[in-house]
Amino acid sequence: MAHETMSFQAEVKQLLHLMIHSLYSNKEIFLRELVSNASDAADKLRFEGLADNALYENDPNLRIRIGFDKAARTITIDDNGIGMSRDEAIANLGTIARSGTKEFFTKLSGDQQKDAALIGQFGVGFYSGFIVADKITVETRRAGLPANEAVRWESAGEGDFTIDAIERAQRGTTITLHLREGEDELLSSHRLKSIIQKYSDHIALPILMQKEEWDQEKGEMVLKDEDETVNQASALWTRSKSDITDEQYTQFYQHVAHDHQDPLTWTHNRVEGRSEYTQLLFVPAHAPFDLWNRDYRGGLKLYVKRVFIMDDAEQLLPQYLRFVKGVVDSADLPLNVSREILQESRDVKAIREGVTKRALSMLEELANAEEEAGKEKYKTFWSAFGQVLKEGLGEDHANRERIAKLLRFASTHGDTDAQDVSLADYVSRMKPEQSKIYYVTADTWQAAKNSPHLEVFRKKGVEVLLLTDRVDEWMLSFLHEFDGKPLASVARGDLDLGELNDEEKKAQEQAGEAIKPVVEKMKEALGDKVKEVRVTFRLTDSPSCLVADDNDMSGYLQRMLKAAGQNAPAMQPILEINPEHALVKQLNADSASFGDWCHLLFDQALLAEGGMLDDPASFVKRTNALLLSRAA
């Protein structure tokens, strides 16, 4: 096919500009990204070669070769992986196919190190070559295609690229970087080796370079006619833990997770028995930008007998652990395993159970750490992934107790919104006469902390958990008790503090009798707005509050469902009034303004719990009328 010039997709032009002008101080990443792509090409060949061994073309020894030419001022990255066809070269090098392109650009922070990590995460690492090169030439032939169907792709990174048909005997891809002025320091074996060993030492393929030796006569380093392997070239997880440094684990994590930060913790072990596999699992220090997207692909890299199978084997982890990164290498699964087989395999079920237990053990070690550094790591983990972990209470019945021990909440025990109180902490501080774990749900920490429902608890010195995450109401439908102590909402049902409130109960009953006519008239005045009006002892400073009946949905959950566009069943709350409050004491059931006072007490209670008024204008009008009547 003839020489053809094509234009880059608009997003690629934007990306090229970013690469060239914004990431220069982090230019070493170009080699990391191109080596990573070459490694992926080898993985793809291994995978496709399982079904068609002829793709190896009698050249089964996969490798990456890196070279440089001082005279031509070029660096080459050559692999004998899967290669590309003409259409694949156009698609992979001329467009960004990923749906998250816009998100990529919105996530750029200006922090060069962070932005450099995003490049790999979005699969656009090839373009990082333009940081150091003003022209890139790619020659490639897909395994299985004839030599005359190879292609040359070339671009100066300025908006278009050319495609030519060429002859190429070797399958795979050769990338030639024509260096920009001022980049000659890269034309050195020592410099390139140091970059490879810094970023790509963990790559399982051998990375070859021409040997370089000192020539006494010439007084300089000269290239020899033989290659040497410049990386470890063995799968990290297959090596003994004692032979792997923390730095090597960290580099490997950054490779598999496309993350610039260090992991919080990791675990590495071999499992033998009914299922044989090796697992290397990491907990990241921060959540990926798309963790809550519907199409987020969690899961681990799956290998079978060291042969790469797939990138995101979701079946190996429950959804609530989707943030865990790493590798599972199975000795038992068939090499032709598919996603469908993964869903039905007994071996996979055993691996999933084992991986889940190991991941939870990893979190337990952090959560129970005695030293300050470990505690800080768990706080970091919780702020990033706490809401995701809460999903496990509904998803994983077998491990529900273990997950419950890992939960952290804000509470009235502290003065900040920090979620650092475990259920075990709460139980250890319970009053001797206290039989329940109390909580309140609200939209914000401020709203929860100032909820009128907490007044009697403050008076009695009883701790209350402050739950403000959107997942909390759902979580509570699965978390009914902890350590034999039932969880109870302070805003639901008829409050019973057991022996803690015997005196108040007697006083409440007496006060209730005294204002019984007023309570009955209030119910008439409010009509269908409320299920019931009753006297309460849960208030000490506020005149009124709303509570849900024992089996009804809370107001907070109703608001959440409405915000999510779902139909929330209409619920009638219970209005509780404080007989000791001056506003309640002055209520006169026979006055003309009695109905307005009743509605005001209801509306105030609704606002105090974070609710929305159905008719704000009437509320303002009613309040103004009552204020004027008082002033008069």
Curated annotation (Swiss-Prot):
Signal peptide residue numbers: none
Main localization category: cytoplasm
Protein name as it appears in the record: Chaperone protein HtpG
GO CC annotations on file: cytoplasm
Residue ranges of the region described as A: 1-339
Keyword Ligase belongs to the record: no
Taxonomic classification: Bacteria, Pseudomonadati, Pseudomonadota, Betaproteobacteria, Burkholderiales
Organism: Burkholderia ambifaria (strain ATCC BAA-244 / DSM 16087 / CCUG 44356 / LMG 19182 / AMMD)
Quaternary structure and interacting proteins, as annotated: Homodimer.
SMART domains referenced in this protein's UniProt entry, alphabetically: HATPase_c
Region feature (C): 560-632
A single MF term (Gene Ontology): ATP-dependent protein folding chaperone
Pfam entry (one): HATPase_c_3
Protein encoded by which gene: htpG
Record's subcellular location: Cytoplasm
NCBIfam families: PRK05218.1
Stated family: Belongs to the heat shock protein 90 family.
CDD domains: HATPase_Hsp90-like
Function summary: Molecular chaperone. Has ATPase activity.
